[in-house]
Amino acid sequence: MIGLDGQRRPEDSPRMTYEPMPLNPPPYGSATLPDLACSLLASLRVPGEPDVLGLPRADRACLLVVDGLGWDLLRAHQATAPFLSELAATAGPISAGFPSTTVTSMSSLGTGLPPGGHGMLGYQVARPGEGKLLNALRWDPEVDPVAWQPAPTIFERAADAGVHTCYVAAAAFRGSGLTRAFARGVDYRGVHSLGELTAGAQEALRSGVADRTLVMAYHGHLDSTGHTSGVASDAWRYQLAHVDKLAEQLATGLPDRCVLHVTADHGMVDVGLDERIDVDAIPALRAGVALLGGEARARHVYAEPGAAADVLATWRELLDGRMCVLSRDEAIAHGWFGEVAPEFAARIGDVVAASYGQAAVVASRAEPQESALIGMHGSLTQDEQLVPLLTLTTV
């Protein structure tokens, strides 16, 4: 037996079959972000798109994506967000998908596919055969976004059906590798403030370029505030109040025959110092590991040749009760990623570890900035998976 200090202990019992506490896979095909994307197209009468969620039909649809606005967080702060909470009183949540992180969730929204179908499988994933990671937020000029994520986007499919599309988000994201991967074929409107985001979305809805319009608006400051200050902080609550006002102002300026939907890419939990397991301080967790991908609450662990079984056994032993640790084949079989296209399977770690509770596997030397975050996400817990689906219509 190996302790969390990395030292081997005498065996005190026979090795048992691994039976982790259950982490339920997202309900792909019934109530997840990719289902929302397809249903959104169906609501605009795009042929061939499954209307899983039964969204109201309209000529114009706006999807406001608030990064980090988990369902449980919203319900716990009703006084801070009265407008959104009023909508939530007659609505419910859907699930983000795994891992519950921006790269994966925005790609699910942008393609209508589960993570295993679009291949954007985490914050950092292996580039198979190259011995290096792709950080999908920062991207790498060596990687072609179209080759990495080749599926047609919802914006391309909408355009083929005569629907005008617009994506309103920070100007800094225009042309990024991630944007080109999940938002190809869209009219990108870069903004610098909440006011510009609101006005830009309303102007796009009223543009009259086509008889049907789809607008996606993305706001990321709630997530960044949660990362740096924590979701239990005053700063996070103040930022939530700004988000509530943003949604209210956007709603008051909707044109006729329009539907506004509000959702998020994931929730968030605060991780205390005593809940952090540092792989850079525990040699046993680094043994046999070629690359450490994913993020602190959803790890892709890529083993050196021939070491996958040993890495799996060690991670299970050291992280028992704190992380659910599966092999690649087990994670796929459990449905964590949805149906996985064969060409994307090697991007998944030889070992996949998802957090229970508030645990996190950090890497203080290799990932100093990420390891210092207070708010984190990525796993399959309810706090991270459930996101709101709020709807307001002028139809």
Q: What do the PLM-derived regions correspond to, one by one?
A:
Residues 9, 14-48, 76, 81-92, ...:
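His/Asp/Glu-rich, glycine-adjacent segments
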Residues 61-69, 77:
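A structured, charge-rich N-terminal accessory region that forms the first stable segment of a protein
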Residues 63-65, 214-218, 261, 352:
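Structural motif
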Residues 67-68, 266-268:
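Active-site metal-binding loops of divalent metal-dependent hydrolases
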Residues 88-106, 285-305:
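A short, conserved beta-to-alpha structural element at the edge of catalytic cores
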Residues 222-260:
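A long, amphipathic alpha-helix that forms part
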Residues 268-294:
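Acidic/histidine-rich catalytic neighborhood
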Residues 290-395:
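Active-site neighborhoods of enzymes that stabilize oxyanions during catalysis
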